[in-house]
């Protein structure tokens, strides 16, 4: 019988939530998930806990840094957590923090109520043993592109029944992640700007396929943002179907559609800079 061994391991704390009051009319909600990977065989295999901090301590460091950060700097908070934890645990090899940040603003005319702004900002920071920090941004949004996307000239076999389409509706979930070359001046605002630029690029680039569309969108983002060295984009597309109205005195004129939620088409591309 072959012997068994521990191959990989990690542990951490998920969904640690705080609200920071940044002013009379502005609060910031931050949700953190913290993970540490390392050589913790003694903990997993032998049950010796002297190598690790309790995960409650992860939460305490996050809350302490969030409360002391000037202007709720996401980079300062995330990297601060990683620095503290990895310096305390000599067997830690890689640390990562995912932060989801949402601004809340007070409703006009109501001194007691606040409402969450959209969108939330999703970022992550990863630190290795060399202290180097890798920063990434994320976005996920359901979008509709009403025209400008064709699909024709594709290969056919005996079971291909799809017709060429000169212009179609694209409706589905757009997801993207990108990696920063360095530290953005304002990580919150930078993520919002990249996401808006991505959506604008996806909607404006004419294309002969969804695959070409997501590549062009990624290339346009990299061309506009020199501080990003790669972006990965995926799109899960739902089918759409024109609704034929039963009333004899009314016509659709391509204004009324329904979504077909299954099956879902998927496309993915990673766009990088040449070395």
Language model segments and positions:
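N-terminal intrinsically disordered, cationic/polar leader segments
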Residues: 1-275
């Amino acid at each position: 019988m072959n012997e068994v061994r521990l191959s990989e391991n990690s542990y951490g704390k998920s969904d640690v939530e705080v609200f920071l009051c940044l002013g009379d009319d502005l609060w910031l909600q931050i949700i953190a998930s913290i993970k540490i990977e390392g050589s913790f065989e003694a903990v997993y295999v032998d049950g010796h806990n002297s190598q690790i901090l309790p995960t409650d301590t992860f939460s305490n460091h996050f809350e302490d840094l969030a409360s002391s950060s000037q202007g709720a700097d996401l980079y300062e908070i995330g990297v601060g957590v990683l620095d503290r934890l990895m310096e305390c645990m000599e067997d830690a090899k890689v640390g990562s923090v995912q932060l989801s940040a949402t601004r809340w603003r007070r409703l006009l005319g109501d001194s007691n109520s606040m409402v969450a702004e959209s969108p939330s900002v999703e970022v992550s920071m990863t630190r290795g043993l060399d202290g180097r920090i890798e920063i990434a941004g994320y976005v996920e949004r359901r979008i509709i592109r009403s025209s400008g996307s064709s699909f024709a000239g594709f290969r056919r076999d005996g079971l291909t029944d799809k017709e060429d389409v000169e212009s179609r509706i694209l409706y589905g979930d757009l997801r993207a992640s990108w990696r920063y070359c360095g530290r953005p001046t304002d990580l919150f605002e930078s993520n919002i700007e990249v996401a808006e630029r991505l959506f604008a690029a996806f909607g404006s680039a004419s294309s002969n396929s969804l695959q070409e569309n997501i590549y062009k969108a990624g290339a346009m983002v990299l061309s506009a943002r020199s501080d990003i060295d790669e972006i990965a984009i995926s799109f899960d597309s739902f089918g759409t179907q024109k609704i034929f109205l039963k009333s004899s005195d009314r016509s659709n004129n391509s204004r009324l559609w329904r979504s077909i939620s299954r099956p879902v088409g998927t496309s993915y591309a990673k766009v990088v800079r040449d070395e």
